[in-house]
Structure formats: structure tokens, C-alpha cells
Amino acid sequence: RAEVSDFGPILLARALSLNTTQEQALQLIFAWADSQGLELVDLPDLRSVISFLTSEDGKDELAGIGGVSKATAGVVLRALTALESQGGGQFFGAPGFDTADLIRSDSSGRGIISLLGVGDISSRPALVSAVIMFLLADLFSSLPEVGDVERPKLVFFFDEAHLLFADA
């Protein structure tokens, strides 16, 4: 699992198959939520923020964040609904992913193998590629550079690597 805030607007836009304009609107929405101290834990949190910004009460806030149109916000909401209908909502929430979960060993010092099953990849390739990118980015930012070691602490294999480069 990952919190929506941790996943970020760029990877979420990829998972939602948004175009550049819609991705930029999502970035503005994330920035507004951050400026208001709102933590986006799951998709309903993001939906609530977008719904507020497109409501009568939030129209001034919406105008103040760079002119996100109601139509663009509507596209993002529909994309969220589609992602949820494909089971994508199960990925977002708390507690968030912790890199340490992948770097565990048993009492004798042998590594523990962790598997991430994603089921039918063909039904949600954009989400799968975004999740893999999220995991790689999180590992890159949280693991220290150690140079050449006798044994690696982590070995990361993933199938369907071509998904990372589609629309790159």
C-alpha cells in the first residue's frame, strides 16, 4: 500500500492515464492540498479535495490555484472512478509502503523473499507500471549507497519491464 500523497501526482497521473494538461491540474490540486495541510491518504481523500474545489464553496480556491477547469477536474474524477472499479483503490491507503519490509532476514541471516502479486496485469497496465516506478523511486531515495559488497541486501526482479517504458 501507499498513501496517495507519497505516490505523488506524477505517478498517479500515469496510473490514471491522464494527458499533460490533466497531469498539471493534478499537480496543482496536490499542491493546494499540501498548502492546506491536508494529507491525501487514499483515493476518497483525493476525491473529496477535488469535489470541494469544484463545488460552490471551493470555486474561489479553485480559481486561485492556477485555473484548473471544472471539465479537467471532472476528467480526473472519472479517471479515479475507473481506477477504483479496476481495484486500484486497494493499493492506496495507510499504512504506507516501508522499504524495510523488503529487506528482512531470518534468525540465521538468510534473506526473506517477498513477492508482490498484481493479478491480471492486462486490465491495469498503467497502474502496475506506476507502482513499479514508485517502488524503484522509494528504494532509490531510501537506501544508502554502499558500493561493492560481498552480498547484496536487496535483489529486485520484476516481470513486464516493458510497462515502465511505455509512453516514457
Predicted features along the sequence, with ranges:
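P-loop NTPase motor domains
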Residues: 1-168
